[in-house]
Amino acid sequence: MRCLVALILTVLIVTPEVEAKTLPDKFLGTFKLERDENFDEYLKARGYGWIMRQVIKLAGVTKKFRNAASGKPDRYDMENLTTKKDTHHKDWALGEEFQDEALDSTQHKITFDLKDPNTLTETHIKVDDPTDVETYEYRRDGDYLVMKMSWKGVSTSRYYKKQ
C-alpha cells in the first residue's frame, strides 16, 4: 500500500501539468483575401507553371477561424473557402497534429500552434512527401490577418480583411 501511495505522489509531483492552449480571440473570425505581395514569385519558387499560377492568383480566398462546432473547449475549426476548392479542418487543438486534405487535394499532416501571443502558425507536411514542409505565419495588423509564407528564400504576404 505504501508503494502505491508513493507511486501516486511521484506521478503527481513529477508529471508537469499539461495546460491546453487557447487561440487568442483576435484570430477568430472571417477574413477575405484583399491583396498580396510577391505571390507570383513565391508560386514560381514552389514550381507552379504560368497557367496554374494564374488560376491560383485569380481564386478568391476566405479564411474562417472559429471555436469548434463540437463545443469542446480550446478546440477550433478552420475553413479555406476558394472559388476552386474548399477545405474544412475541424475540431483541432493548438499544438496537435492531424491529417486532412489540403487545397492541393493531397493528404497533409497539419499543425496549428502559437509561435508567440501575436503569431499563429499553420504547418503542413505532405503525407506522400515528408520532405515537403511548409509553414504559414498569421499575424493581425489592424483589420487584416496577414499570412506570410516563404519557400527557398522567396517570401510573400497575403492580406485578408476581417469581415
UniProtKB/Swiss-Prot annotation:
MF (Gene Ontology): lipid binding
Tissue: Abundant in the fluid surrounding the developing embryo of Ascaris suum.
UniProt signal peptide: 1-23
Lineage top rank: taxon: Eukaryota
Entry keyword Signal: yes
Record keywords, A-Z: Lipid-binding, Signal, Transport
InterPro entries referenced in this protein's UniProt entry, alphabetically: Calycin (IPR012674), Fatty_acid-bd (IPR000463), Lbp1-4 (IPR040094)
SUPFAM superfamilies found in the cross-reference section: Lipocalins
Protein's UniProt keywords contain Cell membrane: no
Description of its domains: Forms a beta-barrel structure that accommodates hydrophobic ligands in its interior.
Function of the protein: May play a role in sequestering potentially toxic fatty acids and their peroxidation products, or it may be involved in the maintenance of the impermeable lipid layer of the eggshell.
Similarity field: Belongs to the calycin superfamily. Fatty-acid binding protein (FABP) family.
Name the record gives this protein: Fatty acid-binding protein homolog
Source species of the chain: Ascaris suum
